[in-house]
C-alpha cells in the first residue's frame, strides 16, 4: 500500500502541508522521505516498525545490513535512511566544528536542544582537543545512570578512538532537579580515576535540566 492509499487526514504529506513538519512523528517524517512501501507492507507501518525496533536515538548508527532485515526495506530505502543521517551529521559538524568550551555554561549552551527525549536520562561525552574545542559529541547511553550500565572503559575507549585530549561528561535529569545522586557522584569519581590512569583528563561532569545545570568542576568536586 502506498501513501496515497491512506486516509487523507492521516497522510503525512497533507499533514505536513497543513500543520508543518513539527506536527509529524519521526515515523511519519521518515515515511514522507521514503514515499512508498511494497505490495505487502504499508510504508507508514514499516517506518513505525523501524523507529520502534531501533529507536530514533540509535537509528543514525544502524547499518545498511540491519535496515534491510526490516520487511519492506530494500537496499535503496536503506541507503536513503543512512544518507539522511550522514547529511545531518555533516550539518551538525559544520555548525559546531571546534566549538570551544571554557565553562559549564558553555556546555549547557552547546547541549541545549540536543537531547532527543528529555523524559529519559541520556549520557553524552564531549571529546575535546588541546584547545578545549569539541571534536565530537557522542551519546553513550539512555536510561538510569548507574555502574551496571556505564563503565569507564566504554567512555575512554571512545576518547582514545577520537584522539581526545580531555573529555566532559554530560547527562540530563528529567525531573528537573540537577543535584547529583549518589550514583552520579560514584561514577564521576570512577571516571576521574580512570582518566588519570589513561592520561585523558575528565574536565567536568555536567548535569542538565531544561533550564539549569550542575557542574562538578565548579562545585570543587573535580
Curated annotation (Swiss-Prot):
Record GO terms (molecular function): metal ion binding; metallopeptidase activity
Source species, domain of life: Bacteria
GO annotation (BP), single: proteolysis
Pfam families given in the database record: RadC, UPF0758_N
Binding residues for Zn(2+): 171, 173, 184
PROSITE patterns, A to Z: MPN, UPF0758
Motif JAMM motif boundaries: 171-184
Tagged with keyword Metal-binding: yes
Matching SUPFAM superfamilies: RuvA domain 2-like
Keyword field: Hydrolase, Metal-binding, Metalloprotease, Protease, Zinc
Entry keyword NAD: no
Domain MPN: 100-222
NCBIfam families found in the cross-reference section: PRK00024.1, radc
Sequence similarity: Belongs to the UPF0758 family.
Protein's UniProt name: UPF0758 protein Cag_1513
Amino acid at each position: 500500500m502506498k501513501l496515497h492509499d491512506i486516509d487523507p487526514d492521516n497522510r503525512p504529506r497533507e499533514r505536513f502541508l497543513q500543520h508543518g513538519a513539527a506536527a509529524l512523528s519521526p515515523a511519519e517524517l521518515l515515511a514522507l522521505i521514503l514515499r512508498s512501501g511494497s505490495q505487502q507492507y504499508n510504508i507508514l507501518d514499516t517506518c513505525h516498525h523501524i523507529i520502534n525496533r531501533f529507536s530514533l536515538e540509535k537509528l543514525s548508527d544502524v547499518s545498511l545490513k540491519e535496515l534491510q532485515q526490516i520487511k519492506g526495506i530494500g537496499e535503496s530505502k536503506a541507503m536513503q535512511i543512512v544518507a539522511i543521517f550522514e547529511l545531518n551529521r555533516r550539518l551538525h559538524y559544520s555548525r559546531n566544528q571546534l566549538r570551544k568550551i571554557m565553562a559549564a555554561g558553555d556546555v549547557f549552551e552547546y547541549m541545549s536542544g540536543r537531547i532527543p527525549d528529555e523524559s529519559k536520562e541520556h549520557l553524552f561525552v564531549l571529546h575535546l582537543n588541546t584547545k578545549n574545542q569539541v571534536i565530537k559529541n557522542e551519546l553513550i547511553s539512555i536510561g538510569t545512570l548507574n555502574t551496571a550500565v556505564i563503565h569507564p572503559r566504554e567512555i575512554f575507549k571512545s576518547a582514545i578512538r577520537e584522539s581526545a585530549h580531555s573529555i566532559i561528561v554530560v547527562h540530563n535529569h528529567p525531573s528537573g532537579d540537577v543535584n547529583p545522586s549518589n550514583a552520579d557522584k560514584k561514577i564521576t569519581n570512577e571516571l576521574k580515576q580512570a582518566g588519570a590512569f589513561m592520561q585523558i583528563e575528565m574536565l567536568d561532569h555536567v548535569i542538565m535540566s531544561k533550564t539549569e545545570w550542575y557542574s562538578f568542576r565548579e562545585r570543587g568536586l573535580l
